[in-house]
């Protein structure tokens, strides 16, 4: 009976103890292998096996006895455990002495650099603010706009400042106008109710109800849908103003002119910011996205430069840093920049679809570089210096008509006697590396240099077409340059392919060479550079189309609405404060959605599970990878799931924040409704306390005492400056107030943009603007009246500002530290899903079910999203460090080390995914008996890793201690290799190994043909590197277990 791959119903090796006594009778079950010389049994696992044995011996673990019990049921697995040991405490990093104060010259240079970058933003911000102040200080204009309430005009300018792209500014202006209209409509309704049929005798209760409803709705809307925050703030400001500005005496008619005063002032502020944004240093997003692509190409070029630079080629830390920077440039900065571009109205010269294709093709081209072995030893200092000296003397070849690199070229080289001798003498490690270096170093150097030249040309071309005045002749020059790069790149790829074939036909692939880690790294390095170059040709082709389609066009937002509604533009997120947290939550939502989509996607070519089992009478069996194992949804009823989503949104954290926010808002407005205080509350404009509270509050800003001190200090400075502006000679002189505005606005604007102190600067400017203008409109200007008005209003602003931060410290508190545990839990879950996909879809995939284009595309999305999630979580750690230590000391170094291991784990998963698609693990087994014997052990290895991931994920999400007994991933994998080597030795002793009893290959495959032999060689290389990557995953996972126990604690301790 034929053994079905992936079926756990077959007997395991432990149940086949008589296998070693069967002699040669097992020969019919032997699977054909293709090369005796290059595929020794166990060679692809021997290096990893040796490493695991050393780790097991050196760690002092004591394996627990399993008494020979074996799990044979579907859906269960056997795990290997070690006796728990006390986790050694990780020493915190040595704290360095505080840095000495930078010299004055250095600080002046840093100041000049910041000024050179942000001077346009400072000018735009200052012009808009001063224009708003001038309109308020010119009495005829201010009387018509809104009289004393014209101070809403500069406040609206400050909230919606013009230093944004035109598309974003237009969007937030429309949002705020809608919020203003809704707020005035809502308030007009309640004012009408308060003035009809004597209902308004106790209008405070009605206004209280109005404010409660509006506060709940506006705060929930901003918390649930981040993109609508400006509509929510405008609605909240308007509703709060009208809830506290009713006439102070019962029976008085409402002053309906207040609707004109507040509405026109706020509207004029919105339109003024929009006009300044459009006409003064306008930004349409065109140059920004062009610079983003250019910067990403430059970072890739730097990595390749270091690889062929004699000074840095052996500097592994420098190369790792350049590699990480290149990965971050593509996966994070370029990706975020394109999302920013696609999420807004843009006036650009780029075609949106071609720009997306360029982003995707550049991401694919950079993907092999993140798994590039850096210690390959293929390029040495001496050779690089020699190649660089010889390169200027040889003119580059511009071959225009070159066939595609994937075409098969006839190799004219023949096996020389020298090559044969080299192949026989390839036993030395150094000699193996020298042979590969001799054959490939010059060719790969030329290919890397051509890649650098292509990236440089791409960077220059992007910079040129990003300019608004690029001419047709310049575009023609760009096209000619890119075509030359494309031709040269094809030629270099062809030469490398010829070298491949020469190397394979020379008989240099030997078992000794393959068992040399340096050799396998060098061969993988060649393949990854070749893949990068091949994908780079696609990048250049897309850029040629982009260059040919350059003309001005308007591109509307094309981001998916269900994701765009939660995404706030970068500048707006900075303005809201705690931009790290905004970025973290946006990234977390995108990553969760992407993983749910990917994890539940069926990419197999077998449309039904039963397609794998076409025989009659056989029930469908559980596959090696089942998407229902860890599905997010616990119900298949769509209506029930939608109801759960609705209930979660109404009663979730957003709703809790809305209730807490509204309680504080009502408390700040309460004096405006009480008979004993509502007169002075309106007279001294204390209604600005709840208004500034609405403006400054942020649900996801934990902050600390230092942030509170800075915000309050800014408020005191603003109030003091406002009193000084009115108290100066010629009381409340508009020219003096305008002068004071200029003197305050310029440094604060620089502080706003250059140092990203957004909320404290905004609070300072509002606390200057409101007291200055309110005092300016007083009928009587005396020293006492100016002091009383300015400081009474200022104290109200201080109270509202003070409440905007501690609200997050009490009742349903938000802290970055509590969120960090959930972030780590999510990362563990996503890493587990990625591991399961790699194991099920790549390593143990079904027969004739190779990963297709869809599978690879989803893998690329998954890897990019995980990289973004890791960086966002690192930013969350930095936010957690700034929080005060109240209950216990926060050990950030443990989370930093944990995330470092996550990063290594992710890179190994990416490496395993790239390698696993090139070989079939079942073909590495010598016979079907071995495959059947190893099925349960392979199941145990994968299932143990997944089980550990999910146990740790649940511990972090619930805050529970880590169980004392968890499977030891090193022991489980070592057990698999032990069994594999024992089977190989038994088969060799019986004389039934593939070396002596391999049946003839199928008729359609000639194992002696050069192409078949070359493929066998590369299969062996990929298998060795894959085994090493999967072993690294087990090693890293054991260290993650120890760190989790140190962070959360261990049960029983």
Swiss-Prot record:
Glycans are attached at residues 464, 469, 547, 647, 701, 1003. Signal peptide: none annotated. InterPro entries: Brefeldin_A-sensitivity_4, IVT-Associated, Memb_transporter_dom. Residues 1-38, 991-1014 are annotated as: Disordered. It holds the Pfam family FUSC_2. GO terms for cellular component: membrane. PANTHER family: 60S RIBOSOMAL PROTEIN L19, PROTEIN BRE4. Belongs to the BRE4 family. This is Protein BRE4.
């Amino acid at each position: 009976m034929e053994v079905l791959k992936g079926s756990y119903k077959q007997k395991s090796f432990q149940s086949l103890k008589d296998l070693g006594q069967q002699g040669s009778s097992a020969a019919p079950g032997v699977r054909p292998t293709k090369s005796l010389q290059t595929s020794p049994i166990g060679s692809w696992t021997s290096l990893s096996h040796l490493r695991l044995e050393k780790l097991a011996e050196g760690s002092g673990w004591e394996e627990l006895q399993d008494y020979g019990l074996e799990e044979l049921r579907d859906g269960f697995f056997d795990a290997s455990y070690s006796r728990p040991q006390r986790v050694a405490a990780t020493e915190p990093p040595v704290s360095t002495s505080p840095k000495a104060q930078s010299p004055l010259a250095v600080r002046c240079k840093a100041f000049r650099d910041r000024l050179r970058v942000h001077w346009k933003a400072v000018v735009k911000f200052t012009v808009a603010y001063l224009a708003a102040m001038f309109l308020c200080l010119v009495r005829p204009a201010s009387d018509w706009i809104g009289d004393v309430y014209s101070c809403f005009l500069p406040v609206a300018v400050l909230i919606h400042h013009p230093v944004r792209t035109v598309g974003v500014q237009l969007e937030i202006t429309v949002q705020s106008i809608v919020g203003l209209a809704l707020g005035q409509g809502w308030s007009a309704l309640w004012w009408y109710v308060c003035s009809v049929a004597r209902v308004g005798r106790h209008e405070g209760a009605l206004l209280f109800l109005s404010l409660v409803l509006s506060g709940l709705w506006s705060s929930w809307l901003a918390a649930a849908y981040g993109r609508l925050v400006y509509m929510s703030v405008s609605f909240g400001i308007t509703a709060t103003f009208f809830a506290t500005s009713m006439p102070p005496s019962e029976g008085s008619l409402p002053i309906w002119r207040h609707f004109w005063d507040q509405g026109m002032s706020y509207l004029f502020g919105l339109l003024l910011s929009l006009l300044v944004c459009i006409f003064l240093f306008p930004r349409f997003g065109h140059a920004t996205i062009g610079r983003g692509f250019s910067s990403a190409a430059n970072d890739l070029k730097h990595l390749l430069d270091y690889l062929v630079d004699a000074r840095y080629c052996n500097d592994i830390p420098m190369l790792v840093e350049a590699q990480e920077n290149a990965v971050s440039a593509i996966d994070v900065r370029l990706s975020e920049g394109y999302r920013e571009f696609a999420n807004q109205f843009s006036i650009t010269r780029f075609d949106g679809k071609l720009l997306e294709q360029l982003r995707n093709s550049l991401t694919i081209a950079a993907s092999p570089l993140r798994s590039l072995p850096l210690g390959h030893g293929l390029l040495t200092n001496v050779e690089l210096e020699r190649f660089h000296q010889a390169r200027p003397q040889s003119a580059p070849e511009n071959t225009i008509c070159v066939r595609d690199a994937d075409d098969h070229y006839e190799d004219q080289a023949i096996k020389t006697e020298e090559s044969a001798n080299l192949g026989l003498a390839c036993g030395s490690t150094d000699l193996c590396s020298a042979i590969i270096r001799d054959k490939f170093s010059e060719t790969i150097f030329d290919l890397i240099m051509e890649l650098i030249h292509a990236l440089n040309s791409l960077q220059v071309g992007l910079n040129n077409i990003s300019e608004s005045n690029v001419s047709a002749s310049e575009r023609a020059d760009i096209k000619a340059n890119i075509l030359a790069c494309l031709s040269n790149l094809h030629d270099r790829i062809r030469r490398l392919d010829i070298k491949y074939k020469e190397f394979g036909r020379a008989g240099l692939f030997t078992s000794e060479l393959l068992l040399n880690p340096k050799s396998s790294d060098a061969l993988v390095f060649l393949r990854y550079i070749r893949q990068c170059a091949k994908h780079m040709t696609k990048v250049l082709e897309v850029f040629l189309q982009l260059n040919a389609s350059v003309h001005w066009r308007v591109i509307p937002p094309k981001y998916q609405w269900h994701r765009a509604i939660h995404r706030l533009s970068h500048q707006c997120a900075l303005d809201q404060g705690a931009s790290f947290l905004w970025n973290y939550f946006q990234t977390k939502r995108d990553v969760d959605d992407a993983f749910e989509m990917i994890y539940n996607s069926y990419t197999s070519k077998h449309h039904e599970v039963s397609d794998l089992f076409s025989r009659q009478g056989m029930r469908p069996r559980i596959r090696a990878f089942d998407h229902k194992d860890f599905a997010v949804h616990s119900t298949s009823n769509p209506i029930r799931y939608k109801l759960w989503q609705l209930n979660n949104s109404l009663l979730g954290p957003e709703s809790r924040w809305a209730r807490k926010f509204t309680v504080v808002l009502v408390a700040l407005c309460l004096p405006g409704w009480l008979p004993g205080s509502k007169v002075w509350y309106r007279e001294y404009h204390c209604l600005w306390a709840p208004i500034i509270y609405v403006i400054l509050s942020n649900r996801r800003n934990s902050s600390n005492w230092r942030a509170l001190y800075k915000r309050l200090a800014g408020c005191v400075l603003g109030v003091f400056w406002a009193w000084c502006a009115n108290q100066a000679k010629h009381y409340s002189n508009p020219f003096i107030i305008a002068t004071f505005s200029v003197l305050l606005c310029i440094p604060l604007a620089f502080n706003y943009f250059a140092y990203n102190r957004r909320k404290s600067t905004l609070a300072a400017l509002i606390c200057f603007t409101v007291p200055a203008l309110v005092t300016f409109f007083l009928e009587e200007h005396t020293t006492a009246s100016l002091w009383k008005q300015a400081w009474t209003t200022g104290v109200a602003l201080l109270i509202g500002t003070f409440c905007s931060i501690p609200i997050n410290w009490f009742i349903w508190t938000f802290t970055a530290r509590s969120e960090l545990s959930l972030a780590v839990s999510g990362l563990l879950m996503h890493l587990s899903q990625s591991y399961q996909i790699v194991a099920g879809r790549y390593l143990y995939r079904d027969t004739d079910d190779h990963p297709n284009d869809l599978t690879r595309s989803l893998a690329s999305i998954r890897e990019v999203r995980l990289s973004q999630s890791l960086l966002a979580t690192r930013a969350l750690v930095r936010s957690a460090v700034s929080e005060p230590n109240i209950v216990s000391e926060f050990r950030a170094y443990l989370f930093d080390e944990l995330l470092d291991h996550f990063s290594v784990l992710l890179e190994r998963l990416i490496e395993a995914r790239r390698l696993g698609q090139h070989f079939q693990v079942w073909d590495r087994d010598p016979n079907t008996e071995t495959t059947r014997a190893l099925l349960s052990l392979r199941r145990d290895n994968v299932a143990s890793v997944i089980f550990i991931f999910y146990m740790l994920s649940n511990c972090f999400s619930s805050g529970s201690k880590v169980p004392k007994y968890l499977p030891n991933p090193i022991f489980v994998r070592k057990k698999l290799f032990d069994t594999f080597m024992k089977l190989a030795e038994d088969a060799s002793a019986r004389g039934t190994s593939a070396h002596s009893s391999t049946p003839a290959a199928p008729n359609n495959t000639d194992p002696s043909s050069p192409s078949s032999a070359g493929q066998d060689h590369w299969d062996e290389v990929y298998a060795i590197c894959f085994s090493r990557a999967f072993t690294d995953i087990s090693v890293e996972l054991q260290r993650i277990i120890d760190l989790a126990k140190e962070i959360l604690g261990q049960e029983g301790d």
